[in-house]
Amino acid sequence: MGKNLLQQRAGKGSPTFRSPSWLRIGKVRYPNIFGHLVGKVIDIVHNPGMNAPVAIIKLENGTKFLTQAIQGLVINQKIEFGKGSPIANGNVIEIGDAPEGTIVCNVEENFGDGGKYARSAGSYAVVVGKSGDKVLIKLPSDKIKAVSNKARATVGVVAGGGVVEKPLLKAGANYWKYKVKAKKWPIVRGVAMNVVDHPHGGGLHQSVSRPSTVSRNAPPGRKVGHIAARRTGRKEGK
């Protein structure tokens, strides 16, 4: 008999399983403006769902935007935005102006996309070369990526790099960590459930108690375990 499984509930798309976008303070991206402008960091805040702190920057033309705060950035710091900005920590530059070896973050692929690469806490990319109208950058994954020389990037390293090393210490901290993401936590094992909740549930002890292999054509409520497995268990030694 089919069961209403966790993945079936998630596939329905109820708010329980969706990312709570209504908690975000705004879109973290560069504004689509041209020219060279001077701005000021008016605040550094936390954006629910992000590990990296977010800087609120106000430009001289009145435009406000959110961007990843970089290491060493402080409130009331002056930054420069756009083509012709010097290579200084916190400035938003056209990546084509950056010499080889420059450390950048929040890098666009093309002008106007708002930033695509090296955006998470503690990450950065390195300018490694130029080829025609493209700039080659080395991503945190060590992959070399070609981006437009008109694309914008922030000089420096995204702040908050030690967040993954900070111990959670208690389950409540982990609860709030996942509460603002599109992830369900905790995940309960099927063998720990009641028989009405999962095909592996029930019994006086935690065991699948039946073959865990299941057909590729099984209905969704029964399609758990080793799906269309050619074999299970350890390989026999020669």
Swiss-Prot record:
The keyword rRNA-binding applies. GO terms for cellular component: cytosolic large ribosomal subunit. GO terms for biological process: cytoplasmic translation. Keywords: Ribonucleoprotein, Ribosomal protein, RNA-binding, rRNA-binding. This is Large ribosomal subunit protein uL2. Residues 200-238 are annotated as: Disordered. GO terms for molecular function: rRNA binding; structural constituent of ribosome. It comes from Saccharolobus islandicus (strain L.S.2.15 / Lassen #1) (Sulfolobus islandicus). InterPro entries: NA-bd_OB-fold (IPR012340), Rib_uL2_dom2 (IPR014722), Ribosomal_uL2 (IPR002171), Ribosomal_uL2_arc_euk (IPR023672), Ribosomal_uL2_C (IPR022669), Ribosomal_uL2_dom3 (IPR014726), Ribosomal_uL2_RNA-bd_dom (IPR022666), Translation_prot_SH3-like_sf (IPR008991).
